[in-house]
C-alpha cells in the first residue's frame, strides 16, 4: 500500500491540503482516507508499527509548523501528538528502534542540523 498524504493545493504556497489517499497496487486503485487534522505540505511522513506519522511542514500561506499527528488505518482516523520543539519544513523522518526521529529541515531562517526523537 502507498499513501499520498497532504500537499500543496497550488503553486503559490497559499493553499495546504489535508487529504489522504491510499493506493493499492494489486487492485490498481485509489481510495480516499480520513484527512489530517492539520493541512500541510513539505512535511515529514513515516510508518511505524502499522501507523503513519506526519510532522512539521508548512500550512496555509507558508506558515512553518511544529505540529505532529498519527494516523491509525484500523480506525481511519488521525490523532494529534505533542508539538515538536522547533517549527520545521523540509524535514526527514525515520523510524528506528520503535521511535520516530525528525531530522534536519528549515525553520524559516536557517537550515537545521537537529535530530529529535
Locate each region found by the language model:
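Kelch-like beta-propeller repeat domains
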Residues: 1-117
Amino acid at each position: 500500500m502507498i499513501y499520498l498524504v497532504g500537499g500543496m493545493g497550488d503553486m503559490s504556497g497559499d493553499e495546504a491540503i489535508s487529504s489522504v489517499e491510499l493506493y493499492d497496487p494489486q487492485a490498481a486503485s485509489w481510495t480516499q482516507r480520513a484527512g489530517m487534522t492539520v493541512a500541510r505540505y513539505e512535511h515529514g511522513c513515516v510508518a511505524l508499527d502499522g501507523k503513519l506519522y506526519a510532522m512539521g511542514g508548512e500550512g496555509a500561506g507558508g506558515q512553518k509548523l511544529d505540529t505532529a499527528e498519527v494516523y491509525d488505518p484500523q480506525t481511519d482516523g488521525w490523532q494529534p501528538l505533542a508539538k515538536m520543539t522547533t517549527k520545521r519544513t523540509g524535514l526527514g523522518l525515520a523510524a528506528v528502534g520503535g521511535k520516530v526521529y525528525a531530522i534536519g529541515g528549515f525553520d524559516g531562517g536557517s537550515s537545521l542540523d537537529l535530530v529529535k526523537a
